[in-house]
Curated annotation (Swiss-Prot):
Organism: Mus musculus
Biased composition (Basic residues): 381-392
Biological processes annotated in GO: autophagy; negative regulation of mitophagy; negative regulation of proteasomal ubiquitin-dependent protein catabolic process; positive regulation of autophagosome maturation; proteasome-mediated ubiquitin-dependent protein catabolic process; protein destabilization; regulation of proteasomal ubiquitin-dependent protein catabolic process
Protein name: Protein CLEC16A
Ranges where the record places region Disordered: 375-416, 437-458, 876-967, 1008-1036
Domain of life (superkingdom): Eukaryota
Organ and tissue specificity: Ubiquitously expressed. Expressed in pancreatic islets.
Amino acid sequence: MFGRSRSWVGGGHSKSSRNIHSLDHLKYLYHVLTKNTTVTEQNRNLLVETIRSITEILIWGDQNDSSVFDFFLEKNMFVFFLNILRQKSGRYVCVQLLQTLNILFENISHETSLYYLLSNNYVNSIIVHKFDFSDEEIMAYYISFLKTLSLKLNNHTVHFFYNEHTNDFALYTEAIKFFNHPESMVRIAVRTITLNVYKVSLDNQAMLHYIRDKTAVPYFSNLVWFIGSHVIELDNCVQTDEEHRNRGKLSDLVAEHLDHLHYLNDILIINCEFLNDVLTDHLLNRLFLPLYVYSLENPDKGGERPKISLPVSLYLLSQVFLIIHHAPLVNSLAEVILNGDLSETYTKPAQDVPRSSAKPSIRCFIKPTETLERSLEMNKHKGKKRMQKRPNYKNVGEEEDEERGSAEDAQEDAEKTKEIEMVIMKLGKLSEVAAAGTSVQEQNTTDEEKSAATNSENAQWSRPFLDMVYHALDSPDDDYHALFVLCLLYAMSHNKGMDPEKLKRIQLPVPSEAEKTTYNHLLAERLIRIMNNAAQPDGRIRLATLELSCLLLKQQVLTSSGCVIKDVHLACLEGAREESVHLVRHFYKGEEIFLDMFEDEYRSMTIKPMNVEYLMMDASILLPPTGTPLTGIDFVKRLPCGDVEKTRRAIRVFFMLRSLSLQLRGEPETQLPLTREEDLIKTDDVLDLNNSDLIACTVITKDGGMVQRFLAVDIYQMSLVEPDVSRLGWGVVKFAGLLQDMQVTGVEDDSRALNITIHKPASSPHSKPFPILQATFVFSDHIRCIIAKQRLAKGRIQARRMKMQRIAALLDLPIQPTTEVLGFGLCSSSSSSQHLPFRFYEQCRRGSSDPTVQRSVFASVDKVPGFAVAQCINQHSSPSLSSPSPPFASGSPGGSGSTSHCDSGGSSSAPSATQSPADAPTTPEQPQPHLDQSVIGNEMDVNSKPSKNSSARSSEGETMHLSPSLLPAQQPTISLLYEDTADTLSVESLTIVPPVDPHSLRALSGISQLPTLPAADTETPAEGAVNPEPAEPTEH
């Protein structure tokens, strides 16, 4: 035999090189099979290779030669495959045979060839063969074989698998026996097979009745019990995982539950009415209501019936409403949660209706009395007995009519008993409640259940589940339960199958509702309370909870025509927003990291809004909120840890509440983001570069490219331009990048070169920034190189400082003025206009006339009012110090954009913890005075001699000692309103207003000299370089 095998392999090889895919070769292989009908250790390899070769020839013949299948069918070659299996030839031959059959059916494309293979019922014989399923490899190839066959199902091929005369459907019944297999890939394959069968059954009434009457109830009841067992295991995992040690197992259990729900939804989507009725009834009465919903009212696990904890119940119900949209199911479930008063009626399993009934009448989570395999076998034998009584298969339709009639009767009986189980308590229906109470007492219930049913009789309108939902929202300690409640409300309101009238009845938000005049005040107050708690320094509200609260509140009160929120609720919301402003003020710093965090958080919030579906896929939120990042939980789903994360959280809370406030008030967002794309220079823009500072350079990119460009520095950006050939003095932008994201370093061996890198802002705080420019800039000499480096470095500092000022304006903080533009002191009107950036002339002109500019009053201004007066008058009286207002003035919020240099000077006179010394512009060319020290000295002097003249002298001396770089640019006109009855200037008098009549202005004719300051406050001559024109002091 061994010699024959060697001869066949050798001869086959030489022949295969000539024509291995041919009818002649198939005849030769048939001859080999006839000579080796018994499997032995010596010939099993030969048989396996022969089967493989036959498969290759069949696949080739399917595309090229139909005579191959004629010969295969004529010689009945499938019998050899079946005989090999029945000989118990060992796992090796079984595995190879199943693998070969799987490949064969996967690659057959012509239906005629498929009919040849499926004829004579040999495939069904292989399906029902008793394989050793304890072998994982055999199990894998077997279920894969069934899955491949199910994919070939259609209206024609289904008759080869389903025999309506014998009431047998081996492909389906053998597959569903593995619905609870421990291997997840096997369970997934079973679901695919059943879905393929259900889709085909829509066009085959006989098969549909078989599935409904013989398999639906046993399969769905066992499936529901299997899902519920997983849910109880999930709940136990949550309850025992105090240290987040079982997160891997918990994630697997949550993923399994999601797979179950998607599978159930796929069955319901097929829209097979018979199946949907049976499945919906089993899900409601055997799983969702007794296990999920009943656990909401009484989460105590001490009772006889299985229950799960409140957070797990809310979490799973949210998943149900997010995934399943079958209207009868979700409306029945929502009716119980929103309006139902449940009277639980449990009986023993022996008192249940028969398992063959289409409707289980008792609402409880119990284990089926029989296994699925046993139930299928019993139904199969019952069908055979009936077939013996009715040998004529044409009478099958009559039998189905009788079964359908009995099923309808059972359905009517079940609907009658529903009044015993659940009563929707409405006004004027107390008789129903009393009837329900008496019927409940007649059941075999526990004393606890009887007392609960008796108490329900006395209530006209009892909604225990809805009350629990609202109660879970009102938890001041943390948001553990609140997050799940919000997800449940969101899922119910966004469910496509939900009846809007059910939600409107209790005034829950309906996103599709165009017009609304009222909303749920209780829910709105709970949501605003969550927002207020989130804005507290010690608040334990996670960002995900806050964002979901804002989303639900907007759904409640916003309509297409406006906002219907009550003034009292809007006032409470504004109070929460103010709290968030104070919270961010606590973390406001002059450091660079705050600006980066501020922009990153805004970018993250706008680019990645909350997706509730993804949120409910995360098993980590089932665990109590933790504050450590070591768990790997996303930042928005846990509490902050450390100052950096607390800063990020405070910024995000501020953004959310600010956005919500603006939307409810119908106002547009005009101040965020800090960098607007429409205001930036873009590639291929054509700019007027006349009178602009340009530095010629050679740009050498990382890949070795070399181009000639001109370097121009703008307020926020650096640009590389080339001359425009059509207009003299104009340039075309070839690259533009933000100064704040730039890094400049020198080149060690070349004093004329700089290494410049500009990074693109990261999409998330954890991602690595991507460099959009990484090149070496070579200038003509080292002087131009130094100038370029200085201009870029100062431009970067200036850009970041201006954005910090805009953040300060958002937070209503005093603004320290930026008095330099790119390092050039504003010494004269000509020099200032010459060095202003080329991009922002129009914005400067709009700054003082912008109608959006509001007035701002800083409380620290009145400490040294004479200082502000002297500075203002000096600036207005000296034309050499006038210049346009900074560009950020036009966009500043809350009045801070119109803040004059008087306001700025006054605010800087008081030391503030919110300002950083790094904000003061310091350059080697222009030494800065110690402004805080001199002001403190002036205040001490004023406090020791409380006279009007000393106040004026201290303020005048402060102006005398300011360097040119500290003199602010000209701002909108200052009006110091004068009252004859006032002794001193008030805070309200120092306000930016439009120009007033001359007689209302205080006239200052002279300024006296500053008295000598203590030695500790004296300044060097270089620090007092500016000597304003003397003026006569005024008296009030």
